[in-house]
From Swiss-Prot:
Source organism superkingdom: Bacteria
Keyword Cytoplasm on entry: yes
Predominant localisation class: cytoplasm
Any single Gene Ontology cellular-component annotation: bacterial nucleoid
Organism name: Afipia carboxidovorans (strain ATCC 49405 / DSM 1227 / KCTC 32145 / OM5)
Subunit structure: Homodimer.
Family statement: Belongs to the YbaB/EbfC family.
Protein name per Swiss-Prot or TrEMBL: Nucleoid-associated protein OCAR_7544/OCA5_c05960
Family matches, as Pfam families: YbaB_DNA_bd (PF02575)
Summary of the function given for this chain in its UniProt record: Binds to DNA and alters its conformation. May be involved in regulation of gene expression, nucleoid organization and DNA protection.
Alphabetized GO MF terms: DNA binding
Alphabetized UniProt keyword annotations: Cytoplasm, DNA-binding
Location in the cell: Cytoplasm, Nucleoid
Organismal lineage: Bacteria, Pseudomonadati, Pseudomonadota, Alphaproteobacteria, Hyphomicrobiales
Length: 105
C-alpha cells in the first residue's frame, strides 16, 4: 500500500511539473529559416507562430513560387526546432523515462 501511495505522490508531482513546463514552453521561442535566411519564421515551442520575416527581394511576382517554397521550408525548420526544444524539456522533467503518449521515443 505504501508503494501505491508513493507512486500516486510521484504522479501528482509529475503532473504539477508538466503543467509548469507547459507554461514555460509558451516563453521558449525558436527560429526557422530558409534560403540563406531570406525567410525566417519565429514560433513558440508550443508551435504558436509569432513572426515571419521575408527579404524584400522576394516580394516580386516572379519570385512567388520561390517565396512559397521558402515559407514552407522555414516553417518546417522552426517546427522541428520547437519539437526538439519540447522534447529536451520533457526528458529533463521525466528524468529520461520513456512515458507512452509523450512523444519522447
Amino acid at each position: 500500500m505504501a508503494d501505491f501511495l508513493g507512486m500516486m505522490k510521484q504522479a501528482a508531482q509529475l503532473q504539477s511539473k508538466m503543467k509548469e513546463m507547459q507554461e514555460q514552453l509558451d516563453q521558449v521561442e525558436v527560429e526557422g529559416s530558409a534560403g540563406g535566411s531570406m525567410v525566417t519564421v519565429r514560433m513558440t515551442a508550443k508551435m504558436e507562430l509569432k513572426a515571419v520575416s521575408i527579404d524584400p527581394s522576394l516580394m516580386k511576382p516572379e519570385e512567388r513560387e520561390v517565396l512559397e517554397d521558402l515559407l514552407v521550408a522555414a516553417q518546417n525548420d522552426a517546427r522541428r526546432k520547437a519539437e526538439e526544444a519540447m522534447q529536451e524539456r520533457m526528458k529533463a522533467l521525466t528524468g529520461g523515462l520513456s512515458i507512452p503518449g509523450l512523444g519522447l521515443g
